[in-house]
Amino acid sequence: MAQDHAQPSGPDLARGIALAELADGGKLVGHFGGEEVLLLRRGTEIFAVGAHCTHYHGPLVDGLAVDDTIRCPWHHACFDLRTGEALRAPALRPVACWSVEQRDGKIFVRGKQAQPKPKPVGKPPGETPKRIVIVGGGAAGFAAAEGLRRGQYEGSIVMLSNDDAAPVDRPNLSKDYLAGKAPEDWVPLRPDSFYSKNRIDLRLNTNVTGIDARSREVALADGSKLPYDRLLLATGAEPIRLPIPGADQTHVFTLRSLADSRAIIERAGASRRAVVLGAGFIGLEVAASLRARDIEVHVVAPDTRPMERILGPEMGDFVRSLHEEHGVVFHLEDTASAIDGKQVKLKGGGTLEADLVVAGIGVRPRTEIAERAGLNVDRGVIVNGHLETSAPGIFAAGDIARWPDPHSGENIRVEHWVVAERQGQAAALNMLGHREKFSGVPFFWSQHYDIPINYVGHGENWDELAIEGDIAARDCLLRFKRNGRVLAVASIFRDVESLQAEVSMERDIST
């Protein structure tokens, strides 16, 4: 995550540039009034929008233009070139738009346009629900609430969260924030004033004990009941706890919440050596962040290679070597059997000293509320293509939802931030009575030191791996196939190709 405060680059667009400098389909960054502006040409039309994605400030000039949209190269947000509107997460804020004049063979930017108000969501048949309750304060829950208000829904919104902090940018908790590269004021998705201003009744430290689908009421731990017309379950997933002696000690952590990340940071300040249990995405992002704090890090995992099941053996070897280059020591094909004070005992017989232990051995969906309510649950809450559960009026989104994925043809559940946000946005529409199928192609990213790994699609049970480029040179694209069909694509510094793969999968769904 980065912010760029350098002087604007490129030509002064108020003075104009020659039309010949911007070929059809071309992009160019200049500046107007001290702000960087992206020019993009489509035939005879010239668009002028903010040069940076509103999510993490990614350079849109390096993105992909598709029809009247521009997609961010970093995390696949998408913006409308005509209005600047953020069309898909992870960006939730629009980019600015400027007026453009073509005269005497030149292109001039004339002024920033007023940001249009988001179009109200069209009214579907039937009665609009007056009361919407959202259980969960993570990506899906926040995106649903934000999307409802952005779409000018006027009814009641209550968001129930058992966290003690308002919704945060959770991917940052294991990346830049944990590494000490991002201040805490980057972490909240919105300031506290956002919720009151938008009439979102955010209730923190609130536990839901049950749902009565017949009476349409949510039961809270304090004994009160909350009526709803539509309900969204977005309870997310929770870290799997270590089932070994000593896992309850104060220097042993899991990572999910802002409070967890704060606690790890505090402990890291007095630590010389850390042991990370698990070599998945969270475990290795934590390892990289702790190395950034100059802490000795040992990673213990039962795998032969890190992340081999998802990314394949070649990428697994690369990830291991990347971390070893930065000083991480791996203890693979082994697990912890006990934690005795500052000693982590390994099943293989060794012992590691640790001032700090972080367990990243996986997560499990929080489905208990859904189960008690009698909803269909099978390794997640079963939903249809509209994200509605087996109980009419109750929807589910995010890490708990198992939905029919049109690309793979399977019912899948994924634990990705962007997917959760996009499902929250789709659920918001469908709670209002729309019947829009969720057909988004899954996407996630992982950051290891200065190396980003982007992943598009869902490649479970792949049987063929095609590698383009050079993984060791950090310039590659991997296609995961089953029966010759591409299910997923992973890449390092192949941003446009990653976006093109996403578009191809989307078009494959629509045909």
Question: Which stretches of residues belong to each language-model region?
Answer:
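A Rossmann-like FAD-binding core segment of flavoenzymes
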Residues: 32, 154, 190-220, 225-226, ...
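Glycine-rich Rossmann-fold phosphate-binding loop(s) that bind the pyrophosphate
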Residues: 136-140, 256-257, 278-280
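Beta1-alpha1 glycine-rich phosphate/pyrophosphate-binding loop at the start
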Residues: 128-201, 240, 287-310, 500
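Mid-to-C-terminal Rossmann-like scaffold of FAD/NAD(P)H-dependent oxidoreductases
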Residues: 128-133, 400-496
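FAD-binding core/adjacent interface of flavoenzyme oxidoreductases
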Residues: 60, 73, 82-106, 110-133, ...
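Rossmann-like dinucleotide-binding cores of NAD(P)H-dependent redox enzymes
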Residues: 164-165, 171-188, 262, 271-273, ...
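FAD-site-proximal beta/loop scaffold in flavoenzymes
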Residues: 248-269, 342-345, 350-426
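N-terminal pre-ligand scaffold of iron-sulfur
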Residues: 1-66, 101-114
